């Protein structure tokens, strides 16, 4: 069997062939053992067709996401120690078009029993992700309620593929056909694959290159659903690739994060902040709309000023990552407030210079980030070089930076920057702002009914537009 397999592994993956051969040979051994323990005849008569349409779920105007439940992998080892499938499924169910579940035991610490556990929690189709080489596995996947399977052309010849795909389709299951190079892509097209997954991972050295999606996607006929797989870590990468792919399969980058809810938001919606929160209800509105960060303003002259106790009360409303906004405060005071409240970051909105930032960095716990805001009128300012985790650009009107409700000339921005953008953002201009390639957007007066009063409808409108891509 390994000789037959070796013939069909693409030339580009020859150096990795022995690893794939080992994985697949181990899979054949697993299949024989499983057939003995759970013969096909014991469950085949009970099989029903899937009623969750994988192909339909991946259709539509917006970018789709197949989010993956993955405990471990050969390249990364153990990825998620606390593998709470109920929690994972409850988060994914809010954002995914389909959910992928690793079922390979030896290399990914998966199990077929994971499939029904996830499926019971969600309404979306569930994809069984495994090294499929035998029709028995397809039947087994359906027995455990999978609605779709992965077929990898790096380990299947055309006849094997046709056989497995036919079994899947007879059971009402969809097929995600994975390719990793142009040769496999040509085969997928000839095999009339409805959904083609482009694996950005190089099977020779396990590195990832997102340009593979850009190179291969234009070769795929119109009407085929294109999914970009592997190496997706940021919303900016998603936006960059969205014109080449209909959707993304994302697993490892999410599974590695302890706060899965915010990790998914960051990739699907972006790393956005709602600033000027003054009440726990407003924190709830921001969180429910899709925000990652919540801003608390400790500048007394601001209409949205909060003291430490009001900030603590506001923070109790929702589990956002909270950012304290300060302006020319003594560094020791900033560090004290940030530490007391357990802030995610402090944002400096005054004339704080490098010496101040160095002093503050030495006073803050390492886990608390430092963000620096700059006012922009007609030119981009020089950014502080050290100890700044994020730079934020806001409109400067006269001597006032920030809180003006105005935008600066966005044509000044570099394409695909690591900057946060603030100033006059609202439902009217958010779609345009989202295309600028910034790391995140910072909303305040544009989502309010009155200063310091966030408007749930305006927030929902803004975040719905952020999802329209």
UniProtKB/Swiss-Prot annotation:
Any one GO MF term held by the record is:
indole-3-glycerol-phosphate synthase activity
Q: Which SUPFAM superfamilies match?
A: Ribulose-phoshate binding barrel (SSF51366)
Known catalytic reactions: N-(5-phospho-beta-D-ribosyl)anthranilate = 1-(2-carboxyphenylamino)-1-deoxy-D-ribulose 5-phosphate; 1-(2-carboxyphenylamino)-1-deoxy-D-ribulose 5-phosphate + H(+) = (1S,2R)-1-C-(indol-3-yl)glycerol 3-phosphate + CO2 + H2O
Question: One Pfam family for this entry, by name?
Answer: PRAI
Protein name (record): Tryptophan biosynthesis protein TrpCF
Q: Which family does it belong to?
A: In the N-terminal section; belongs to the TrpC family. In the C-terminal section; belongs to the TrpF family.
The Enzyme Commission number assigned here is 4.1.1.48, 5.3.1.24
Complex formation? Monomer.
Q: Gene3D superfamilies given for it?
A: Aldolase class I
Sequence segments annotated as region (N-(5'-phosphoribosyl)anthranilate isomerase) = 272-469
Record's keyword terms, sorted: Amino-acid biosynthesis, Aromatic amino acid biosynthesis, Decarboxylase, Isomerase, Lyase, Multifunctional enzyme, Tryptophan biosynthesis
Q: Biological process GO annotation list? A: L-tryptophan biosynthetic process
Q: Quote the pathway field.
A: Amino-acid biosynthesis; L-tryptophan biosynthesis; L-tryptophan from chorismate: step 3/5; Amino-acid biosynthesis; L-tryptophan biosynthesis; L-tryptophan from chorismate: step 4/5
The protein's role, per its UniProt record: Bifunctional enzyme that catalyzes two sequential steps of tryptophan biosynthetic pathway. The first reaction is catalyzed by the isomerase, coded by the TrpF domain; the second reaction is catalyzed by the synthase, coded by the TrpC domain.
């Amino acid at each position: 069997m390994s000789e037959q397999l070796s013939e069909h592994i693409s030339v580009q993956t020859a150096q990795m062939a022995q690893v794939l051969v080992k994985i697949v040979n181990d899979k054949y051994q697993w299949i024989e053992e499983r057939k003995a323990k759970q013969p096909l005849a014991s469950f085949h008569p009970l099989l029903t067709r899937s009623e969750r349409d994988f192909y339909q779920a991946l259709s539509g105007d917006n970018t789709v996401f197949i989010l993956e439940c993955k405990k471990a992998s050969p390249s990364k080892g153990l990825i998620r120690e606390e593998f709470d499938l109920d929690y994972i499924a409850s988060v994914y169910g809010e954002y995914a078009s389909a959910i992928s579940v690793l079922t390979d035991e030896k290399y990914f610490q998966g199990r077929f029993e994971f499939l029904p556990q996830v499926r019971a929690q969600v309404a979306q189709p569930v994809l069984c992700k495994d090294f499929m080489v035998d029709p028995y596995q397809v039947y087994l996947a359906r027995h455990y309620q999978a609605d779709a399977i992965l077929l990898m052309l790096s380990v299947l010849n055309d006849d094997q593929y046709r056989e497995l795909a036919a079994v899947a389709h007879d059971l009402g299951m969809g097929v995600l056909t994975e390719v990793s190079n142009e040769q496999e892509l040509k085969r997928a097209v000839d095999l009339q694959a409805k959904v083609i997954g482009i694996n950005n991972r190089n099977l020779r050295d396990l590195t990832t290159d997102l340009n593979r999606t850009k190179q291969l996607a234009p070769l795929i006929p119109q009407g085929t659903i294109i999914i970009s797989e592997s190496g997706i870590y940021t919303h900016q990468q998603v936006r960059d690739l969205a014109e080449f792919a209909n959707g993304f399969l994302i697993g490892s980058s999410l599974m590695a994060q302890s706060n899965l809810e915010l990790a998914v938001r960051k990739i699907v919606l972006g790393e956005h902040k709602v600033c000027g929160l003054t009440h726990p209800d407003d924190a709830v509105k921001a969180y429910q709309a899709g925000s990652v960060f919540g801003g608390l303003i400790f500048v007394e002259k601001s209409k949205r000023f909060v003291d430490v106790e009001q900030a603590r009360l506001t923070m109790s409303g929702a589990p956002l990552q909270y950012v304290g906004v300060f302006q020319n405060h003594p560094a020791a005071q900033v560090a004290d407030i940030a530490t007391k409240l357990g802030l995610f970051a402090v944002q400096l909105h005054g004339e704080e210079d490098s010496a101040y930032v160095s002093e503050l960095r030495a006073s803050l716990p390492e886990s608390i980030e430092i963000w620096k805001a700059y006012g922009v009128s007609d030119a981009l300012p020089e950014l502080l070089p050290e100890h700044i985790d994020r730079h934020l650009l806001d409109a400067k009107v006269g001597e006032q930076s920030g809180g003006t409700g105005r935008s600066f000339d966005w044509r000044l921005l570099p394409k695909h920057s690591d900057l946060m953008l603030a100033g006059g953002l609202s439902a009217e201009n958010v779609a345009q702002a989202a295309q600028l390639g910034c790391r995140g957007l910072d909303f305040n007066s544009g989502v309010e009914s009155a200063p310091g009063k966030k408007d749930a409808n305006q927030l929902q409108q803004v975040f719905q537009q952020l999802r329209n891509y």
